[in-house]
Amino acid sequence: MALTGVMPWHQATWQHLTRLADGGRMPHALLIHGAHGVGKQHLAEALIARTLCASPADQACGHCHSCSMLASGYHPDLLRVSPEEGKRQIRIDPIREVNRFVSQTAQQGGYRVIVVSPAEAMNVAAANALLKSLEEPGDKTLFILLSDVPSRMLATIRSRCQQWSLPSVAFEACRGWLIEQLGSADEAYFWWQVAGGLPLLAVELAAPEERALRHQIHDSFEQLVRGAEPVSEAARLDRQAIDAILWYGIAWLEDLIRLGLSGEAAVLHNPDLEPLYRQAVKNGRVQDWFRLLDYAREQRRLLAVGANPNPQLVLEAWLVRWAALLRS
């Protein structure tokens, strides 16, 4: 695997991190958090590479033995922890391995680096087990915790990390990169809007299969306005894509609320859906949209933590609630 570079919009953050490292002031634990698609994984990978590199400059040299091992996909002084395949939670056994790992001497004589991603996936037992290592990390140990939603982490874990928040990105800061990825300024700006200022997510959403899903969800909502049965529309949607469906629904509800409160189309992240929004705003009340937004966020949270709600029932209940408001 090639060593990852820092995204253009994170250069200032990167320079701050490298100054800490070069000055011997790097904390033993970093919590890098931001919404999916902001680029935190790229920042973390660049930091991992530079920390393990034998001859770092602004970034890892890419040529030393340590960099070569990392590029090959294995480094003895790097431990990655994430949910097992098919699982949503990080359980205690991988964290016990972390505790063993930090008690050993680095094989390359430098840092030992532990990456936990997504950190909010740790269950309570795993998080409590990690606390011991965070409290007594030993010399030349760096923990990098990555999180989309740090509020779902134990407060005691957060308090033992230096937090680095990566907010959504202004268009001008990522314009050139997005045009390079998507081919035109119009496409770049549209998908940047849809993604809420998250450049990597914008590229994901612009992919053909994601465009098709967005179109299908939009069509289902149009059908609901015309009187279609919510259960029938739920059956048309792919329940395996429930997280994406709820994500779109949340984004569209947030648009509806912005429009309902301001009346201005300029506030929309999905300007192409303005006709649907106008119809919905005409029929529903803002407080009703807030209640539906809370419901959608809670269902998505339950899915994320592995509570295993029935996806088909969630879809049906979700669209029944939408239909009731669209026709009220």
Where are these regions (language model features)?
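Charged, glycine-rich active-site and insertion segments that engage polyanionic ligands
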Residues: M1-R50, M69, D139-L142, D148-S328
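A short beta-strand motif that forms part of the nucleic acid-binding face
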Residues: E85, L134, E209
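Conserved adenine-binding aromatic site and its adjacent loop/helix in ATP-hydrolyzing domains
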Residues: R100, K132, A155, S159
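Conserved catalytic/switch belt of AAA+ P-loop NTPases
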Residues: S103, N128-L145
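Catalytic acidic motif of RecA-like/P-loop NTPases
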Residues: S117-N123, N128-E135, S151
